[in-house]
Amino acid sequence: MPFLETIVELAPRLRRKEVSPLELTRACLDRIEKLNPTLNAFITVTAESALAEARAAEIEISRGEWRGPLHGIPIALKDLIDTAGTRTTAASALYQDRMPTEDAEVVRWLRQAGAVILGKNNLHEFAYGGSSLVSFFGDVHNLWNAAHIAGGSSGGSAAAVAAGLCFAAIGTDTAGSIREPAALCGCVGIKPTYGRVSARGVIPLSWSLDHVGPLAATVGDAAAVLQAIAGYDSLDAHSADVPVCDYVSVLREGARTLRVGVPRAHFYDDLEDEVRAAVEQALAVIETLVAETREMQIEIPTDRIVQNAESYAVHADHVARTPDLYQPETLRRIRFGADISAVEYIRCRLELDIERRRALNIFAKVDLLVTPTTPMPAPAIADLKKDPEALRPAELILLRNTRPFNVWGLPTISVPCGFTKSGLPIGLQIAGPHWREDLVLRLAHAYEQAVNFSAK
């Protein structure tokens, strides 16, 4: 069953023509047909074009025109990433028939790498939430227990990867929306440095905080996808012209020389017992893999005014004209930004830039930080829906540990580190200095190899 293999394992087999891109694509489409009615991970499945892309990849590979490790690999996209000729809805009635005429830059790079696009993943409407329970197309469910959330806002992407509906997915992360669902669904999700991956052609939530990155089954697969999409886009005002290293090759360097910081305050406060136990076990393993671990204190930044003001700026015209096309909870959140003054926003936006410079000081004596990704495992859907006032507080708790790294703009990954007694996944978060995705990936890979949770 090819869906049990990783991209890293399949790539050389595809190149040697031992496995067919058509075989992989059909296997994914079969699993989508079987499991998507339960998970609701996909809004749109582009079966016909995916099979055509797979056939084209097969022909190219047969001619010796292998493009790299993503050639012929089926991948999905969060449905706020533009795709030419395929609707991009942001999980909203407002955009249910929106048909882009151009691919987002990240999609263009994936196509250049030879990836097969399977379709568009469900999400929390306009990426404004951490549960994926607010979507015009219905709730996303967790593979490990369909009565629990998949997280958000990239909930459909995480659920699809965890269930083997695709080999990887591209998500977005404004406060944790790649890492939190990856943790809750038991897969790997990396938020690169702010500006590392182009966000041009991605429907924004907050320009200053939005990041684009991959979700995958393993660290190696996430590295392979990140390799294909990282780079400078001169037409994206937030893109940075910083060299990209070979993320796959650096995994072989291991973590033996790395120094790890453990910021106990905030990140380790008020953890559920099973999360605390799993993370402490993970730290014990990491101590055997690295040069040094040390506890440290970090001042935690805030971003609410920037996010609220920018999200309102994105939606103000539609909110004024067609408020009924938004889900009520999304509309309420967007309106948080309506009364923020220009003076207040500019001051807070300047402070965000200062915080990103201050983040350099975090790594004066350590190379990486390690924290729990979320303070608790995936909540039950029924618990969040029985009280309308319970949803946002629960989401804020789930995103508590991921949010600061969006303010700092630091590269950060979530990797599986255990399960609760009821079988729900638990995630470990690793963060590094700006532009040092390589360090983050090295420790994540070394830990993954030591514990082998991905095999489960």
What are these regions (language model features)?
Residues E48-E58, G114-A115, H124:
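Long amphipathic alpha-helix in the N-terminal Rossmann-like dinucleotide-binding domain
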Residues L10-R16, L94-M99, D210-A217, I334-S341, ...:
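Short, well-ordered beta-strand elements within core beta-sheets of diverse protein domains
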Residues M1-A52, S62, T288, K456:
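An N-terminal boundary/leader segment
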Residues C28, A50, G72, K78, ...:
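Conserved hydrophobic/aromatic pocket- or pore-lining residues that grip, position, or stack substrates
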Residues K34, Q112, A162-D269, E280-L289, ...:
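Structural helix-boundary/capping segments
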Residues L70-V212, A265, T371-L391:
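Short glycine/serine-rich loop/turn segments
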